[in-house]
């Protein structure tokens, strides 16, 4: 009982009181996890033989055997396993290496925490023997791995052995289920052990006091251990080359872990800063949203009023625009049809003159002239219909329009028609008169344009100036339609 108290007291110094018992109870879970990763071909399933809490030495032996046999099985199935299984085997090797390093650390930790009594030497000797056995097992493991390289070429034998391994795996799965049942039993015992934590804590406090007195004696034993380690150093040098590779990998992993920890700390600081900024922004957003809600209410009221006014104006403008657009389109089509008719008539006249000269082609030209006459009749009929529509639209426009404004397209059409009409045609004078009324020319400009002479300018005062531009425009269109 005294030995157990001293051991638990040393563990209490390096770990918290509550975590000590949890660590001893959770060791079966680690053993089961190692079995799941690297299942040895032979494992005792006797529940009485297996302890609930395995000692570090037993764990080291079991793990070394598991490593040995798992590496052999991995060597047998290298050529037949797919790339995913190769990756899994590599992961298992890494886990085995980590288990070996952990066991070494536990052994060194155990050396540091051993009590200075007569049993210490025996236990130290046992630990050294176990370490030597572990090293011999490790050497045998390496020799077996090197010997298995020659077997890789034998694919048929490897496949047979793979089938045997698969059968063993089924057995191991059944053993794994048994171990899981043991784990459940350990969990129940864990609940019972937690009840004893209070009593153990009191004992640990007493043991800590005893430990302080034994530390001085422990220093002497450490000096003796150092002498033994010097003797051990010659043996370790043989394995230093292989261990250096593992240490380099471990150092690289430690550096990566440190870098990741630094990155995590920086990220935590950044996250805290961002959270404070987010809270400030949320407060500002809430205040802005309140102001925005007030402004939205006022804006909605204003927008409703503006929409009502705009809708009224848009409806009026649309009606006027539609009327003007319809008039423009009709006017443009009328002008185009009129120009086409004039061109067709001129071409027909030329053709008729040519037909008089060529008597032999008379019949052919007569048929063509008849077709053209029919087309001209159709075009005139369409022009009459369009003129009727125009007169009706202009009459409606004359009634509805109060303003004397006309857009730029109308002015451009008037100018084009003025330029295209020949000088002898009286329509040119009418178009010029429309432009003068639209642009509100005075008498001087009209005289310069040739609309009125000096005598007519005196009599122009008697003419009524109240006649609007729209009325002149409608009269002009009516005259054009009558001529057509």
Curated annotation (Swiss-Prot):
Sites of Phosphoserine modification: 55, 64, 468
Keyword flag Magnesium: no
GO BP terms, alphabetized: endoplasmic reticulum to Golgi vesicle-mediated transport; Golgi organization
Coiled coil: 84-383
Source taxon at top rank: Eukaryota
Stretch forming the signal peptide: none
Compartment annotation: Golgi apparatus lumen
Comp. bias intervals (Basic residues): 1-15
Task performed by this protein: Involved in the structural organization of the cis-Golgi and in vesicle targeting/fusion stages of ER to Golgi transport.
Protein name from the UniProt record: GRIP domain-containing protein RUD3
Organism of provenance: Saccharomyces cerevisiae (strain ATCC 204508 / S288c)
């Amino acid at each position: 009982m005294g030995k157990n108290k001293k051991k638990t007291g040393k563990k209490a110094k390096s770990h918290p009181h509550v975590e000590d018992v949890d660590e001893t109870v959770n060791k079966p879970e680690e053993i089961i996890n190692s079995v799941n990763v690297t299942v040895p071909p032979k494992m005792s399933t006797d529940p009485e033989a297996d302890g609930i809490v395995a000692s570090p030495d037993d764990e080291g032996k079991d793990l070394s055997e598991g490593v040995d046999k798992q590496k052999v099985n991995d060597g047998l199935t290298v050529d037949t396993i797919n790339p995913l299984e190769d990756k899994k085997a590599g992961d298992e090797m890494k886990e085995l290496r980590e288990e070996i390093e952990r066991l070494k650390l536990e052994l060194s930790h155990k050396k540091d925490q051993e009590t200075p009594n007569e049993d210490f030497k025996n236990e130290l000797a046992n630990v050294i023997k176990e370490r030597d056995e572990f090293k011999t097992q490790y050497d045998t493991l390496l020799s077996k791995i090197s010997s298995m390289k020659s077997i890789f070429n034998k694919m048929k034998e490897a496949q047979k052995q793979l089938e045997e391994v698969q059968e063993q795996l089924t057995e191991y799965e059944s053993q794994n289920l048994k171990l899981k049942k043991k784990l459940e039993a350990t969990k129940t015992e864990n609940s019972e052990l937690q009840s004893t934590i209070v009593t153990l804590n009191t004992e640990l406090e007493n043991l800590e006091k005893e430990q302080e007195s034994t530390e001085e004696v422990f220093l002497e034993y450490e000096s003796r251990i150092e002498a033994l380690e010097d003797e051990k150093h010659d043996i370790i040098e043989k394995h230093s080359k292989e261990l250096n590779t593992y240490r380099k990998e471990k150092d690289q992993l430690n550096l990566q872990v440190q870098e990741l920890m630094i990155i995590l700390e920086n990220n935590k600081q950044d996250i805290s800063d961002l959270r404070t900024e987010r809270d400030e922004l949320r407060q500002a957003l809430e205040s802005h949203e309140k102001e925005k809600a007030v402004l939205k209410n006022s804006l909605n009221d204003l927008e409703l009023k503006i929409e009502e006014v705009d809708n009224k104006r848009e409806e009026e403008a649309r009606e006027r625009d539609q009327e003007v657009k319809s008039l423009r389109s009709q006017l443009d089509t009328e002008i185009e049809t009129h120009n086409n008719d004039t061109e067709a008539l001129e071409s027909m006249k030329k053709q008729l003159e040519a037909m008089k000269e060529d008597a032999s082609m008379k019949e052919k030209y007569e048929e063509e002239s008849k077709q053209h006459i029919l087309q001209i009749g159709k075009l005139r009929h369409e022009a009459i219909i369009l003129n009727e529509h125009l007169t009706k639209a202009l009459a409606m426009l004359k009634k509805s329009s109060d303003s004397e404004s006309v857009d730029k397209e109308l002015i451009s059409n008037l100018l084009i028609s003025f330029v295209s009409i020949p000088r002898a045609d009286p329509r040119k004078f009418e178009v010029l008169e429309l432009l003068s009324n639209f642009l509100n020319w005075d008498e001087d400009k009209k005289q310069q344009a040739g609309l009125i002479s000096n005598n007519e300018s005196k009599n122009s005062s008697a003419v009524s100036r109240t006649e609007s531009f729209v009325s002149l425009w409608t009269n002009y269109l009516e005259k054009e339609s009558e001529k057509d």
